[in-house]
Amino acid sequence: MSTLNGQTALAYAKVWHHVSAKNVPLGRLASQIATTLMGKHKPIYHPAADCGDVVVVTDCSEIGISGRKLENHKYYSHSGQPGHLKEWTMEEMAAKRGHKDLLRRAVGGMLPRNKLWDRRMKRLYIYDGAEHPYKANIFRSYHNPVSSQIAKELFSK
Protein backbone atom coordinates (compact mmCIF):
# COMPACT_ATOMS: atom_id res chain seq x y z
CA MET A 1 0.00 0.00 0.00
CA SER A 2 1.26 3.46 -0.86
CA THR A 3 2.10 5.88 1.93
CA LEU A 4 1.07 8.88 -0.18
CA ASN A 5 -2.66 8.13 -0.17
CA GLY A 6 -3.53 10.09 2.96
CA GLN A 7 -1.14 13.01 2.48
CA THR A 8 -2.88 14.88 -0.33
CA ALA A 9 -4.98 16.89 2.13
CA LEU A 10 -1.87 18.79 3.21
CA ALA A 11 -1.12 19.78 -0.37
CA TYR A 12 -4.64 21.16 -0.91
CA ALA A 13 -4.85 22.93 2.48
CA LYS A 14 -5.76 26.61 2.28
CA VAL A 15 -3.05 28.88 3.67
CA TRP A 16 -4.06 32.36 4.84
CA HIS A 17 -1.98 35.26 3.47
CA HIS A 18 -2.05 38.84 4.77
CA VAL A 19 -1.08 41.63 2.36
CA SER A 20 -0.76 45.30 3.22
CA ALA A 21 -1.75 47.44 0.22
CA LYS A 22 -0.18 50.65 1.55
CA ASN A 23 1.57 52.52 -1.32
CA VAL A 24 1.57 49.43 -3.59
CA PRO A 25 0.58 49.87 -7.26
CA LEU A 26 -2.91 48.54 -7.95
CA GLY A 27 -2.04 46.36 -10.95
CA ARG A 28 1.03 44.73 -9.41
CA LEU A 29 -0.86 43.95 -6.22
CA ALA A 30 -3.86 42.56 -8.12
CA SER A 31 -1.70 40.24 -10.23
CA GLN A 32 0.06 38.83 -7.17
CA ILE A 33 -3.25 38.32 -5.38
CA ALA A 34 -4.75 36.58 -8.44
CA THR A 35 -1.74 34.24 -8.62
CA THR A 36 -2.18 33.33 -4.95
CA LEU A 37 -5.95 32.81 -5.29
CA MET A 38 -5.41 30.46 -8.24
CA GLY A 39 -2.65 28.53 -6.48
CA LYS A 40 -0.02 29.07 -9.17
CA HIS A 41 2.63 29.45 -6.46
CA LYS A 42 2.13 25.80 -5.44
CA PRO A 43 3.81 22.85 -7.16
CA ILE A 44 0.47 20.99 -7.36
CA TYR A 45 -1.24 23.70 -9.46
CA HIS A 46 -3.71 22.52 -12.06
CA PRO A 47 -6.12 24.86 -13.91
CA ALA A 48 -9.15 22.66 -13.17
CA ALA A 49 -8.33 22.10 -9.48
CA ASP A 50 -9.14 24.57 -6.74
CA CYS A 51 -5.82 24.64 -4.92
CA GLY A 52 -5.47 28.38 -4.22
CA ASP A 53 -5.10 30.08 -0.86
CA VAL A 54 -7.01 32.72 1.12
CA VAL A 55 -5.85 36.36 0.88
CA VAL A 56 -6.65 39.13 3.39
CA VAL A 57 -5.80 42.64 2.14
CA THR A 58 -5.58 45.59 4.54
CA ASP A 59 -4.91 49.32 4.10
CA CYS A 60 -6.82 49.30 0.82
CA SER A 61 -7.75 52.96 1.17
CA GLU A 62 -4.04 53.86 0.78
CA ILE A 63 -3.43 51.83 -2.37
CA GLY A 64 -1.09 53.41 -4.91
CA ILE A 65 -2.59 54.73 -8.13
CA SER A 66 -0.03 56.45 -10.34
CA GLY A 67 -0.36 59.03 -13.06
CA ARG A 68 -3.72 60.45 -14.05
CA LYS A 69 -5.58 57.15 -13.83
CA LEU A 70 -8.00 58.57 -11.26
CA GLU A 71 -9.35 61.00 -13.87
CA ASN A 72 -8.78 59.03 -17.09
CA HIS A 73 -9.45 55.33 -16.35
CA LYS A 74 -13.08 54.42 -17.08
CA TYR A 75 -15.34 51.63 -15.82
CA TYR A 76 -18.34 50.57 -17.90
CA SER A 77 -21.66 48.89 -17.14
CA HIS A 78 -24.42 47.99 -19.58
CA SER A 79 -27.92 46.76 -18.74
CA GLY A 80 -28.54 45.26 -22.18
CA GLN A 81 -31.07 47.90 -23.15
CA PRO A 82 -30.21 50.33 -25.97
CA GLY A 83 -28.78 53.59 -24.65
CA HIS A 84 -28.14 52.28 -21.14
CA LEU A 85 -24.35 52.26 -21.18
CA LYS A 86 -23.03 53.81 -17.97
CA GLU A 87 -19.46 54.90 -17.40
CA TRP A 88 -17.55 56.07 -14.33
CA THR A 89 -14.05 57.33 -13.80
CA MET A 90 -11.83 55.65 -11.24
CA GLU A 91 -12.21 58.68 -8.97
CA GLU A 92 -16.03 58.47 -9.06
CA MET A 93 -15.89 54.72 -8.43
CA ALA A 94 -13.59 55.17 -5.42
CA ALA A 95 -15.86 57.89 -4.00
CA LYS A 96 -19.05 55.91 -4.60
CA ARG A 97 -18.01 52.34 -3.73
CA GLY A 98 -14.63 52.73 -2.06
CA HIS A 99 -11.14 51.53 -2.93
CA LYS A 100 -12.16 47.98 -2.03
CA ASP A 101 -14.25 47.73 -5.18
CA LEU A 102 -11.36 48.98 -7.35
CA LEU A 103 -9.12 46.19 -6.06
CA ARG A 104 -11.88 43.58 -6.27
CA ARG A 105 -12.56 44.46 -9.94
CA ALA A 106 -8.84 44.41 -10.77
CA VAL A 107 -8.32 40.99 -9.18
CA GLY A 108 -11.52 39.60 -10.70
CA GLY A 109 -10.41 40.70 -14.15
CA MET A 110 -7.12 38.83 -13.75
CA LEU A 111 -8.74 35.54 -12.77
CA PRO A 112 -9.90 33.16 -15.52
CA ARG A 113 -13.65 33.21 -16.09
CA ASN A 114 -14.58 29.61 -15.36
CA LYS A 115 -16.59 27.69 -12.76
CA LEU A 116 -13.96 28.37 -10.09
CA TRP A 117 -14.12 32.18 -10.41
CA ASP A 118 -16.80 32.71 -7.73
CA ARG A 119 -15.11 30.34 -5.30
CA ARG A 120 -11.77 32.07 -5.74
CA MET A 121 -13.24 35.55 -5.28
CA LYS A 122 -14.96 34.46 -2.04
CA ARG A 123 -11.50 33.72 -0.63
CA LEU A 124 -10.48 37.38 -1.04
CA TYR A 125 -11.11 39.58 2.01
CA ILE A 126 -10.46 43.32 1.61
CA TYR A 127 -10.42 45.92 4.41
CA ASP A 128 -9.86 49.69 4.27
CA GLY A 129 -8.00 49.97 7.57
CA ALA A 130 -5.20 47.99 9.17
CA GLU A 131 -7.53 45.94 11.40
CA HIS A 132 -9.18 42.68 10.33
CA PRO A 133 -10.88 39.83 12.25
CA TYR A 134 -8.69 37.01 10.85
CA LYS A 135 -5.44 37.61 12.77
CA ALA A 136 -5.52 34.11 14.27
CA ASN A 137 -5.71 32.48 10.83
CA ILE A 138 -2.82 34.34 9.12
CA PHE A 139 0.11 32.10 8.23
CA ARG A 140 2.10 34.42 5.93
CA SER A 141 2.23 38.20 6.05
CA TYR A 142 3.52 40.53 3.32
CA HIS A 143 3.74 44.18 4.34
CA ASN A 144 5.45 45.35 1.14
CA PRO A 145 4.74 42.69 -1.50
CA VAL A 146 6.19 44.76 -4.35
CA SER A 147 9.88 45.40 -3.77
CA SER A 148 10.36 47.66 -6.77
CA GLN A 149 12.40 50.79 -6.14
CA ILE A 150 10.29 52.62 -8.72
CA ALA A 151 7.10 51.90 -6.79
CA LYS A 152 8.66 53.21 -3.59
CA GLU A 153 9.68 56.45 -5.29
CA LEU A 154 6.30 56.93 -6.98
CA PHE A 155 4.17 56.61 -3.89
CA SER A 156 6.38 58.07 -1.14
CA LYS A 157 4.77 61.24 0.15
UniProtKB/Swiss-Prot annotation:
Q: What range does the transit peptide cover? A: 1-29
According to its UniProt record, where is this protein located? Answer: Mitochondrion
Q: Which GO terms describe its cellular component?
A: mitochondrial large ribosomal subunit; mitochondrion; ribosome
Q: Name one GO biological process term.
A: negative regulation of translation
In terms of superkingdom, the source organism counts as Eukaryota
| Molecular function via GO | mRNA binding; structural constituent of ribosome
Question: Matching InterPro entries, A to Z?
Answer: Ribosomal_uL13 (IPR005822), Ribosomal_uL13_bac-type (IPR005823), Ribosomal_uL13_sf (IPR036899)
Listed under subunit, the entry gives: Component of the mitochondrial large ribosomal subunit (mt-LSU). Mature yeast 74S mitochondrial ribosomes consist of a small (37S) and a large (54S) subunit. The 37S small subunit contains a 15S ribosomal RNA (15S mt-rRNA) and at least 32 different proteins. The 54S large subunit contains a 21S rRNA (21S mt-rRNA) and at least 45 different proteins.
NCBIfam families, A to Z: rplM_bact
Q: Which HAMAP family match?
A: Ribosomal_uL13
Protein's recorded name: Large ribosomal subunit protein uL13m
The organism of origin for this protein: Schizosaccharomyces pombe (strain 972 / ATCC 24843) (Fission yeast)
